[in-house]
Swiss-Prot record:
It catalyses: a quinone + NADH + 5 H(+)(in) = a quinol + NAD(+) + 4 H(+)(out). NDH-1 shuttles electrons from NADH, via FMN and iron-sulfur (Fe-S) centers, to quinones in the respiratory chain. The immediate electron acceptor for the enzyme in this species is believed to be a menaquinone. Couples the redox reaction to proton translocation (for every two electrons transferred, four hydrogen ions are translocated across the cytoplasmic membrane), and thus conserves the redox energy in a proton gradient. The gene is nuoN. It comes from Clostridium beijerinckii (strain ATCC 51743 / NCIMB 8052). One of its GO terms (cellular component) is plasma membrane. It holds the Pfam family Proton_antipo_M. Keywords: Cell membrane, Membrane, NAD, Quinone, Translocase, Transmembrane, Transmembrane helix, Transport. It is a multi-pass membrane protein. Its main location: membrane. Belongs to the complex I subunit 2 family. Its EC number is 7.1.1.-. This is NADH-quinone oxidoreductase subunit N. The lineage of its organism: Bacteria, Bacillati, Bacillota, Clostridia, Eubacteriales.
Length: 472
């Protein structure tokens, strides 16, 4: 029963769809039901055979679907993100509809399929399931902004899927297979043709959209601003890490022997993503757009682990993914609470937040400083291992550039902190109410960022063992 996590997730999706149609009176209870079910699935995943047995992996359909410690780690990451998303969504008007939660679980299932796929067609199926679910979720508010954001996401997603499929067809045309393991064998034994290199470039471009890597980032600011904020954070965290997981499996195992052909492209993408993401974030006055460009710059840091092309590089991506999840959940959770109270997402609306809600201000402070990589918070540990991995690779200049961009990011993060603690006091100081479910999600996020920043050794050991098992 090593695939029980996926089966339970699919069953939950069906139950939610049926319940939303037949149990109209209990629609508002579905958020609690969904949260509890997702938490139970997370507990089941924590005790799953693949993670407990370290390097042991199992496969279905001739290796098309793989369950190993690598995929299990990311599934747990997605489940945590889904649980926290449900918690912070409970007070939203859009969350009163049962299908809202069915779509979240549907997107979650698509991500699980993506990270466990050992075959390009299976990856595409998971990718489309996730994308279609997000297209509907982004438009869920029903206003003009969310509809526009959904349409943009739909059109650009279709383009990225077409690019991915074209790359897939080129790889298949040369290697006569879509199985990642067989592609790896074909690349090792044969001479790499120009069309294969072109296919690799198209595959990278297809997933660069999902991760919001420059120049495939154009959708992120508008969609982050227009979508319901709880969906924005789920998209920013889970969708990004799902794309990263696929890139890792595809290029670190399937195409590692051809790394000399694609690694320079990844370096270029990382540099322009780091520079543009951080510089364009500086003048932003809308908090969601600022966090969108912050998310774009974070994608550049993630690419450092792929550039390292080593066990430490993979481990650093796993580690940073975990910390990135909680930092974004904390920041966007505060955005939801403040936006609900003020009706705006402007940074100026956070004036004197420390007086209006000390709890929200503290969560935002810790989340932003963690994203900036300030010790002793968890984000510092994640960035430390990312920088260490590329230094071991000999890319000293890239490490210094990344550190410099981190210093720049401190400026625009502290701009928000300054407004919260020292901004011009509004004429009327009104306290901002925070629901129990939102407070629980924010407390979990803040606690994890602090504790794992001070005591990271246990988590570091886990990701190192997962990365070694993945490469073996």
């Amino acid at each position: 029963m090593s695939y029980i996590v996926e089966l339970l997730t699919a069953a939950l999706c069906l139950v939610l769809l049926i319940a939303s149609l037949s149990l109209q009176r209990y629609k508002e209870k579905l958020s609690l039901f969904t949260g509890i079910c997702l938490f139970i699935i997370l507990i089941v995943s924590l005790f799953s055979e693949a993670l407990l047995n370290g390097s042991q992996s199992q496969s279905l359909f001739g290796g098309a679907y793989i369950n190993d410690s690598f995929s299990t780690f990311f599934k747990q990451l997605f489940l945590i993100a889904a649980v926290l998303t449900v918690l912070i969504s409970r007070d939203h008007l859009v969350s009163k509809q049962g299908e809202f939660y069915a779509l979240i679980v549907s997107a979650l299932l698509g991500m699980m399929i993506m990270v466990s796929s050992g075959e390009l067609i299976a990856i595409y199926i998971g990718l489309e399931l996730m994308t279609i679910s997000f297209c509907v979720l982004i438009a869920y508010k029903g206003d003009d902004k969310s509809k526009e954001a959904s349409l943009k996401y739909l059109i650009l997603s279709a383009m990225s899927s077409a690019i991915f499929l074209y790359g897939l067809s080129l790889i298949y045309g040369i290697t006569q297979t879509t199985a990642i393991k067989e592609i790896a064998e074909a690349l090792v034994t044969g001479q790499i043709a120009p069309l294969e290199i072109l296919g690799m470039i198209f595959l990278i471009a297809g997933f660069a959209f999902k991760i919001a890597i420059v120049p495939f980032h154009m959708w992120a600011p508008d969609i982050y601003e227009g979508a319901p904020t709880s969906i924005t954070v789920f998209l920013a965290v889970a969708s990004k890490t799902a794309g990263l997981a696929v890139l890792l499996r595809l290029f670190m195992t399937g195409m590692s022997s051809a790394s000399s052909y694609w690694i320079d492209l990844i370096i270029v993408l990382s540099v322009i993503t780091l520079v543009l993401g951080n510089l364009v974030a500086i003048p932003q006055t809308n908090i969601k757009r600022l966090l969108a460009y912050s998310s774009i710059s974070q994608a550049g840091y993630f690419l450092l682990g792929i550039i390292a092309n080593s066990s430490l590089g993979i481990a650093s991506i796993l580690l940073y993914s975990l910390f990135y999840l909680f930092a974004n959940m904390g920041a966007f959770g505060v955005v939801i609470a403040v936006s609900k109270a003020t009706g705006n997402d402007q940074i100026k609306d956070y004036a004197y937040l420390a007086k209006r809600s000390p709890f929200l201000a503290a969560v935002m402070l810790i989340s932003l400083l963690s994203l900036a990589g300030i010790p002793p918070l968890a984000g510092f540990i994640g960035k430390f291992y990312l920088f260490l991995s590329i230094i071991e690779k000999g890319q000293i200049w890239l490490a210094f550039l990344s550190i410099g961009m981190s210093v720049i990011s401190v400026y625009y993060y502290l701009k928000v902190v300054k407004v919260m603690y020292f901004g011009e006091s509004p004429t009327k100081l009104e306290s901002i109410p925070v629901s129990i479910s939102t407070k629980l999600a924010l407390t979990i996020s803040m606690t994890v960022l602090v504790i794992l920043g001070i005591y990271p050794s246990q988590v570091v050991n886990v990701v190192l063992s997962v990365s070694k098992a993945f490469l073996s």
